């Protein structure tokens, strides 16, 4: 799920194509995550029958596997994962297996970046409120009636 607006990247499925592939969504299998020093990985196994309903332009015709899909494209096929995953390879002997990776500390870095952005936004709001209070106070002082001398 996206929390902000972005332009779709890749080739969007038609409503009819999407309906056909989503029939298989509950049968998609997600491996446990595994990692090396830089990345965490997982593989996603699509039902073999699903490959028959995925549009041909999603495939690399030279090797007979799915081509590397954009995040929007693989999400459009019904693959659901948290943010940061990148489709980087297809397993040629088993074309229904898609390999994904993301930086090892992606979620921690995302949380830290989100917290920093929220803190910055709060500081900006506080500064704006202080400026508004100062302006209101200045206007109020300017409007005070001078005491009359009798």
From Swiss-Prot:
Signal peptide residue numbers = none
Region (Disordered) spans which residues? 115-150
| GO biological process terms held by the UniProt record | cell division; positive regulation of transcription by RNA polymerase II; regulation of cell cycle G1/S phase transition; regulation of mitotic cell cycle; regulation of transcription by RNA polymerase II
Keyword DNA-binding attributed: no
Q: Which Pfam families match?
A: CKS
Annotated keywords: Cell cycle, Cell division
UniProt-recorded Gene Ontology molecular function terms = cyclin-dependent protein serine/threonine kinase activator activity; histone binding; protein kinase activator activity; protein kinase binding; ubiquitin binding
Key word S-adenosyl-L-methionine present in the record?
A: no
Which segments show compositional bias classed as Low complexity?
Answer: 115-137
GO CC annotation terms, alphabetical? cyclin-dependent protein kinase holoenzyme complex; cytoplasm; nucleus; SCF ubiquitin ligase complex
Assembly, in brief, is: Forms a stable but non-covalent complex with the CDC28 protein and with a cyclin.
Sum up the protein's function in the record's words: Binds to the catalytic subunit of the cyclin dependent kinase (CDC28) and is essential for its biological function.
Q: What else is known?
A: Present with 8780 molecules/cell in log phase SD medium.
Q: Which family does it belong to?
A: Belongs to the CKS family.
* Name of the protein in its database record: Cyclin-dependent kinases regulatory subunit
Which species expresses this protein natively? Saccharomyces cerevisiae (strain ATCC 204508 / S288c) (Baker's yeast)
Name the encoding gene, please.
CKS1
